[in-house]
UniProtKB/Swiss-Prot annotation:
This is Biotin synthase. Catalyzes the conversion of dethiobiotin (DTB) to biotin by the insertion of a sulfur atom into dethiobiotin via a radical-based mechanism. Belongs to the radical SAM superfamily. Biotin synthase family. It comes from Aliivibrio salmonicida (strain LFI1238) (Vibrio salmonicida (strain LFI1238)). Coiled coil: none annotated. Its cofactor is [4Fe-4S] cluster; [2Fe-2S] cluster. It catalyses: (4R,5S)-dethiobiotin + (sulfur carrier)-SH + 2 reduced [2Fe-2S]-[ferredoxin] + 2 S-adenosyl-L-methionine = (sulfur carrier)-H + biotin + 2 5'-deoxyadenosine + 2 L-methionine + 2 oxidized [2Fe-2S]-[ferredoxin]. The lineage of its organism: Bacteria, Pseudomonadati, Pseudomonadota, Gammaproteobacteria, Vibrionales. Pathway: Cofactor biosynthesis; biotin biosynthesis; biotin from 7,8-diaminononanoate: step 2/2. The keyword Nucleotide-binding does not apply. [2Fe-2S] cluster binds at residues 97, 128, 188, 260. [4Fe-4S] cluster binds at residues 53, 57, 60.
Length: 350
C-alpha cells in the first residue's frame, strides 16, 4: 500500500462502511507493514498552565467562557515541571508533553518554555508542547530549544468547525501546523469524535489530516469527554464500534503515523481498547488525567499491556536502565501496594 495525500470524503466513507471485521483486518495488515507489531509508545502530559483560556472551544472545561470545576493556575515553575518529567520517565513514559491553556504563548513566557524543553531533554525524554497558536518565529525558538513534537489539533472537519469554535479559524490551525513543519518539528494533530458531527464530518477530518503535505507523525483520536458546565455536556455517546472503525480508517489513511488513543479512554473497557490496538493504535497517554479529565491510571495500563503481550517503547535505552519487559513486570507486581495516585500528572486530548 502506498502513502497517499489525495484522499476524498467519498473514499473514506466507503472505508468506514466496510464490514467491521474486514476493516479491522485491513488496518492490522497495514499496521504490520508500516509499524512495529505489539508495541505501544507511551506519553505523559502535564498541564503547565491550567484554566482561564480565552478560546470558546465547546468541549473544553478550561475555557473562561464556561463555568466548570477547573481552577485557574499560573504557569508552573520550571523545576516543578522537571520533577514531574522525572517521575514520568520512572513510570515508563518515553515522551513528556506539556500543555498550556492559552490562545497563544506570550513572549514573556518563551524563556520559561525553552528552559522546560531543554530540561526535559536532558532527562532523556522526547518533548512535546501544546500552547495554542504559534508564530513562525516562536516555532523556530521552540525547535531551537530541542522540541520534538508540537500538538495542534484540527478537532473536526472544516464544515463543522464553526459549530464548536469561533475564537480561532480553521486556517489559523493550518497555519500553526505549517509553522511547526517549517521549523523542522514533528506534528501531533488529530481530532475529537462525539461533538455532534456527522459521518461526513468525521471523514472530512481525516481527509484534512491525510492530505497535508506530510502526514502528522502522531494522530491523536479523542473520544469526547463530557464535562459538566461545557456546552457539550449532554452530547450523545459515541458508539464503540464506530470509534474503533475510525481508528482503523486513520491507520489505513496514514500508515506511517502513530495513531494515539487519547481522551475518552477512561470510559473504554479493556476489550474496546484491545480492539483499538488491533485496529492500529500504537500510542497512548498514560497516567491519572488527560489535562483536566480522567484517564486510566498507569498500573491499569501496564496490566492491560501485559495481558495483550504489548511492550511500551523506550526512546533511549541506556545500559543501566530497566528493560521494557522488566518494567512491565515491576509495575504489575506493585499494584496492590501502590500509594495514592499523584495528581501532578495530567493527560489531555492532544
Amino acid at each position: 500500500m502506498e502513502v497517499r495525500h489525495n484522499w476524498t470524503v467519498v473514499e473514506v466513507k466507503a472505508l468506514m462502511d466496510k464490514p467491521f471485521m474486514d476493516l479491522v483486518f485491513e488496518a492490522q495488515l497495514v499496521h504490520r507493514q508500516y509499524q512495529e507489531a505489539n508495541y505501544v509508545q507511551v506519553s505523559t502530559l502535564l498541564s503547565i498552565k491550567t484554566g482561564a483560556c480565552p478560546e470558546d472551544c465547546k468541549y473544553c472545561p478550561q475555557s473562561a467562557h464556561y463555568r466548570t470545576d477547573v481552577d485557574r493556575e499560573r504557569l508552573m515553575e520550571v523545576e516543578s515541571v522537571l520533577d514531574a518529567a522525572k517521575k514520568a520517565k520512572d513510570s515508563g513514559s518515553t515522551r513528556f508533553c506539556m500543555g498550556a491553556a492559552w490562545k497563544n504563548p506570550k513572549e514573556r513566557d518563551m524563556p520559561y518554555l525553552l528552559d522546560m524543553i531543554k530540561g526535559v531533554k536532558d532527562i532523556g525524554l522526547e518533548t512535546c508542547m501544546t500552547l495554542g497558536m504559534i508564530t513562525s518565529d516562536q516555532a523556530g525558538e521552540l525547535s531551537g530549544a530541542g522540541l520534538d513534537y508540537y500538538n495542534h489539533n484540527l478537532d473536526t472537519s472544516p464544515e463543522f468547525y464553526g459549530n464548536i469554535i469561533t475564537t480561532r479559524t480553521y486556517q489559523d490551525r493550518l497555519d500553526t501546523l505549517s509553522h511547526v513543519r517549517d521549523a523542522g518539528m514533528k506534528i501531533c494533530s488529530g481530532g475529537i469524535i462525539g461533538m455532534g458531527e456527522s459521518v461526513n464530518d468525521r471523514a472530512g477530518l481525516f481527509v484534512e489530516l491525510a492530505n497535508l503535505p506530510q502526514h502528522p507523525e502522531s494522530v491523536p483520536v479523542n473520544m469526547l469527554v463530557k464535562v459538566k458546565g461545557t456546552p457539550l455536556e449532554d452530547a450523545e455517546d459515541v458508539d464503540p464500534f464506530d470509534f474503533i472503525r475510525l481508528i482503523a480508517v486513520a491507520r489505513i489513511m496514514m500508515p506511517e503515523s502513530a495513531v494515539r488513543l487519547s481522551a475518552g479512554r477512561e470510559s473504554m473497557n479493556e476489550q474496546m481498547q484491545a480492539l483499538c490496538f488491533m485496529a492500529g493504535t500504537n500510542s497512548v497517554f498514560y497516567g491519572c488525567k488527560l489535562l483536566t479529565t480522567p484517564n486510566p491510571d498507569e498500573d491499569s495500563d501496564m496490566q492491560l499491556f501485559k495481558k495483550l503481550g504489548v511492550n511500551s517503547h523506550q526512546v533511549a535505552q541506556k545500559p543501566d536502565e530497566v528493560q521494557e519487559h522488566e518494567l512491565l513486570d515491576r509495575v504489575a507486581e506493585r499494584v496492590a501496594s501502590r500509594p495514592d495516585k499523584n495528581d501532578l500528572f495530567y493527560e489531555a486530548s492532544v
